[in-house]
Each structure stands twice: as C-alpha cells, then as structure tokens.
C-alpha cells in the first residue's frame, strides 16, 4: 500500500462548545495534495482525558495514504463518561469532513483502547449514530466486555440485541480488530474472543495481531515519567504502527 506524500495538520479546531465548560477540540491530519473526495476517518483515543496528541503518529501515517483523519479530544471523566464528546465529534465529521477533502457521508470509525470499545459499540448499534453513516469500524487494542463509552452497554452483550441481529449479515458494518500480540495492558484475547463472537453472528471481521504491545500498535511507547504514550523512533514499533494504519486504510477502501 503506497503513500501519497506529505501531510498537513490543522490543530485545535473546536468541535463542541458547551456553556460553562472548555471547548472541545480536534486535530485534522490530511494529505497535502488535493485528491478526489473519499472516506473520512474519525480516530478516538483511549481513556486518558484529552489525549488526542497520543494518536498523532498513527493519524499522520493514515493521512499519508490519502485519507483525512480527524482526532478529537474527549474526556472519560465527564459525567456521561465522554459520550457527548464522542457523539459531537461524529457529527462534526459528518458536517465538516468535506472541508478537509473527506466525505462526511462515509465515515470509518476507529478507536484505540477505550476508544476501540466506543467505536465497536456504535458499529453494533447503527441506530445510535444519530444519522451518521459508519461504513467500517476498527478497534485497536480494545476490550469489548465492558460498557462502551459511546453507548453505555458492552459490545459483546449488544451482539445478542435485536438491533445488532438485524445489522448482521450482508448489510453489517465491516469490523477490523487490531491487537498487539505482546499487549500486557489489555490481552489480545479480548480481540480474539470478540472477533469469534462477531463471526458466530455472521459479522464480517478482519483480525490482525502485530508483534507489538499496547502502545506500539499506535507508533508510540509508554513514558512512565510523563504517564502517557509518546512517539517512538524504534523501527519495530513503527512497523507495528504501519500495520495498524494499513488496516484502517484497507477498511476504508474495501467498502
């Protein structure tokens, strides 16, 4: 899968303003060169509040393949667990993606760690996307037996719901699951188990286990002094992150 060249970054666009609260912001990573309008990628970070910067290396890599990527801050410590932030960012992509060369009517929803569960929650409950058309969902290093921040219910439990059952089969949102084989934060068994459950219900699933850990699959490494993931220059980490990016790009282009 070839890259298209350099990328452009637009930082700290406001996607949600709430009275009495700081504005919620997002970053856009897009190809520098003009291209035909294609799918847009909405990429959600994990449980750490307002950590969009953590996903910048992965977002740049995806954008280098020709897709606009929008990465919002959101707060898991909000009273609703972050749901209003996540949903507002989804609506923002629908309404504004065209400004960055993307199609707001074709959204690839991807998330890492807690963001993965949030993405899968909406993939299984298309009626909860507020009219936004999600064409593919990608979960990276996620856990799916806990309530998703986007829906309040566990994706694994949602598989038995009437809505998920109606969405399975030919019309199902294709799912891609990426999980580092050496992940010691969230075992890759979570993705394997979820993938198996999806397949049992007739869901189209692609699974990938790069030789990496929880941070490496997004081109980062954990810095204990700072308490967060930071960009890595290690070749094996970059290789794993490129696999993740390629999986997201493939999900966008095979729909």
Predicted regions and their residues:
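N-terminal cap/lid segment of alpha/beta-hydrolase-fold proteins
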Residues: 1-36
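Short beta-strand element of the alpha/beta-hydrolase
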Residues: 36-46
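The serine-hydrolase catalytic nucleophile loop
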Residues: 48-60, 74, 189-190
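Conserved alpha/beta-hydrolase
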Residues: 64-79
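Primarily recognizes the serine-hydrolase "nucleophile elbow" in alpha/beta-hydrolase
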Residues: 91-158
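Short beta-strand/loop motif that positions the catalytic acidic residue
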Residues: 171, 177-179, 183
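Conserved alpha/beta-hydrolase "acid-adjacent" motif
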Residues: 184-193
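C-terminal catalytic histidine-bearing segment of alpha/beta-hydrolase fold enzymes
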Residues: 201-255
């Amino acid at each position: 899968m070839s890259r298209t060249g350099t990328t452009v970054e637009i930082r700290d666009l406001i996607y949600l303003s709430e009275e009495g609260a700081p504005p919620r912001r997002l970053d856009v990573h897009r190809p520098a060169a003009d291209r035909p309008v294609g799918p847009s990628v909405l990429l959600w970070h994990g449980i750490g509040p307002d950590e969009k910067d953590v996903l910048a290396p992965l977002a740049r890599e995806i954008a280098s393949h020709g897709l606009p990527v929008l990465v919002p801050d959101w707060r898991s410590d909000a009273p609703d667990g972050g749901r209003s932030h996540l949903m507002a960012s989804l609506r923002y992509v629908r309404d504004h993606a065209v400004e960055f060369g993307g199609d707001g009517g074709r959204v690839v929803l991807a998330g890492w760690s807690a963001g993965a569960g949030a993405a899968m929650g909406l993939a299984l409950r298309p009626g909860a996307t507020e009219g936004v058309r999600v064409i593919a969902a990608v979960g990276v290093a996620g856990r799916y037996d806990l309530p998703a921040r986007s829906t309040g219910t566990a994706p694994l439990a949602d598989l038995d719901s009437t809505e998920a059952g109606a969405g399975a089969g030919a019309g199902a949102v294709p799912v891609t699951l990426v999980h580092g084989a050496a992940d010691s934060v969230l075992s890759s068994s979570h993705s394997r188990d979820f993938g198996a459950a999806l397949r049992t219900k007739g869901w189209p699933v692609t699974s990938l286990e790069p030789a990496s850990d929880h941070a490496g699959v997004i081109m980062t490494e954990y810095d204990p002094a700072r308490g967060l993931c930071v960009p890595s220059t290690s070749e094996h980490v970059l290789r794993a992150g490129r696999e993740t990016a390629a999986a997201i790009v493939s999900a966008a282009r095979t729909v």
